[in-house]
A protein has these predicted regions:
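Cleavable N-terminal export/targeting peptides
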Residues: 1-26, 341-353
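Subset of outer-membrane beta-barrel
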Residues: 25-353
Length: 353
């Protein structure tokens, strides 16, 4: 009896998690080297780097579940002159998949930003990002009858009809927009601090108008992407330690609102310009009455190349703070970044020494 009750509770909870994963919330890129560009179209070209980025994010749950995300992007930052106010151009590819039933979502997107320099120390960029989403389920991965699937819960005998419905391959055209800015100001000991801030909106287009599906409006309503609002604020304070060791301490706050899902993440990163960064963060996820906490640890390594080229390697580990719940998953993300050109910073240099 006790086992049956636990099974019912597990099925109910996992179905709740599925509804969050597949309908209510987008996959988040967790590493500082990538989260700005994948979370705000206006950040395209803002850091002045032209290069290529690849990454993978994998989640391990309390039940046997393998949820993976793959990220690829290319960034190009325009020079200050003869660009008609353009900031940068970025291309994105993202693939989310749950391997036990092969639920796949693919994203193809391009972001273009325009720059407005309000003063010597303040610059703003606005950006647009048209996107294509492709969603599908592999029906051969589903087993009918009394199967307890780790992602979908219990698969019932009525699944043939549901399987033919969800196996529909859906293609979505969507649009995102954002604004990103930075204000620099002088502080003591010949350094420059900066305040960065951004706001973005994803899934602007009405979903029932953006889907191209064999099953028409019914499939569109079932597979809708809820509008997502994201905000980001960070403060970077320079610390020159001598011997040309320049470090920056950056506390940050990120907020995401998507349908009934709320995310609040805050933390701090300590970066050395030549070597890399280390960071620590805490994220709270809220879905109606459900609240989940996650601890994030960030590591980054800079590998200099030529004069204006080099490599970056990023790693993030996410560990749940609420152990013992069904919603516990440890995620690992690894990313590699290669840049071949550095455009001069939009504002003044951070260190004078």
């Amino acid at each position: 009896m006790c086992v049956g009750i636990r099974l019912i509770i597990s099925v109910t909870f996992l179905l709740l998690v599925v509804s969050v994963r597949l309908q209510a919330q987008d996959t988040k890129v967790s590493h500082p080297f990538m989260w700005k560009s994948f979370n705000n179209p206006a950040y395209s070209g803002f850091d002045g780097l032209a290069g290529v980025n690849i990454g993978m994010q994998r989640s391990y749950w309390s039940k046997p579940l393998d949820f993976r995300s793959y990220f690829v992007s290319a960034d190009y930052a325009f020079q200050e002159k003869r660009t008609f106010g353009l900031g940068g151009l970025s291309l994105f590819y993202q693939r989310d998949q749950e391997s036990s039933v092969m639920y796949v979502t693919q994203l193809f997107a391009a972001a273009l930003s325009a720059r407005v320099k309000l003063s010597r120390s303040t610059v703003l960029q606005v950006g647009l990002q048209p996107s294509l989403y492709c969603k599908s389920v592999d029906p051969s991965k589903l087993t009918l009858g009394d199967q307890f699937d780790p992602f979908y819960g219990q698969i019932l005998d009525i699944s043939p009809e549901l399987m033919s419905f969800y196996a529909d391959k859906v293609t979505i055209f969507d649009m995102a927009a954002g604004i990103y800015g930075q204000t620099d100001f002088n502080v003591a000991w010949h350094g420059v601090a900066s305040l960065e801030y951004g706001f973005s909106v994803y899934h602007i287009i009405e979903s029932t108008q953006s889907f191209l599906s064999e099953h028409g409006s019914a499939s569109s309503e079932e597979n809708l992407l809820n509008r997502r609002y994201s905000g980001y604020v960070s403060y970077a304070h320079p610390f020159a330690l001598g011997n040309q060791i320049n470090t920056v301490l950056s506390p940050y706050v990120m907020v995401d609102v998507q349908s009934v899902m709320r995310n609040l993440q805050f933390g701090v990163c300590w970066e050395e310009e030549r070597f890399g960064l280390i960071g620590l963060g805490v994220r709270g996820d809220q879905f109606e009455g459900l609240q989940v906490g996650t601890l994030l640890v960030h590591l980054g390594v800079n590998i200099p190349g030529g004069r204006d080229s080099g490599w970056k390697i990023g790693y993030t580990c996410e560990v749940p703070t609420h152990q013992g719940t069904m919603y516990q998953n440890t995620s690992h993300s690894l990313s590699l970044h290669w840049y071949y050109r550095i455009v001069p910073k939009r504002c003044i240099q951070r260190f004078d020494n």
